[in-house]
């Protein structure tokens, strides 16, 4: 994961993302909002009521407003390797969150502990041989009963493949399938990890989206979530 790679695209990220996801019929805000709503439902089902949240790989801050909306009383820390992305997020979202940068390898010692670590489509930008180590560090930053909620692109979905292949800032991305990502999470010391597939229907078929709750085990959704503790 190279900070300069995202420093170069920080101010054009949303335009590039919108172009890459146009086949879905949805705006960038939709993808951030659904993930955070899912995270809230997952946390509630796990009896986890976050007072401190880490947005790991927060980028240009697409998840900040949804996180503040769904968890209005929680303290939010945004952590990313790209200083330009963090600056853009601060300008866009204000000074409410604690904005931090790091070197892409070692989490800052003074981050503290969190009830929820949220990370959205970040690990496909991190070299695979670093995944377990970073996940292990994230685990050590969770409070008792804390929760990791991780979202990633599903490489088994052809539209996802097309979207990633056509996105300039994903040029060096290496997609990870759900079972493999789950193995890495467990290898990092998490005791339990729940895999669910999401985003089966594009906007023209949005009326069918209530059916998705019945399809979470079907490995054809455009993305997936992993909830671990």
What is the predicted role of each segment?
Residues 31-49:
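Conserved alpha-helix/loop element of class I SAM-dependent methyltransferases that forms part
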Residues 164-180:
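Acceptor-substrate binding/catalytic loop of class I
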Residues 145-152:
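Conserved beta-strand signature within the Rossmann-like core of class I S-adenosyl-L-methionine
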Residues 118:
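A conserved beta-strand element that flanks and buttresses the S-adenosyl-L-methionine
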Residues 132-144:
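A short glycine-rich, Lys/Arg-flanked "PGG" loop and its adjoining helix->strand segment in the class I
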Residues 99, 193-229:
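A C-terminal cap/extension of S-adenosyl-L-methionine-dependent methyltransferases
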Residues 1-20:
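N-terminal, positively charged/glycine-rich alpha-helical extensions of SAM-dependent methyltransferases
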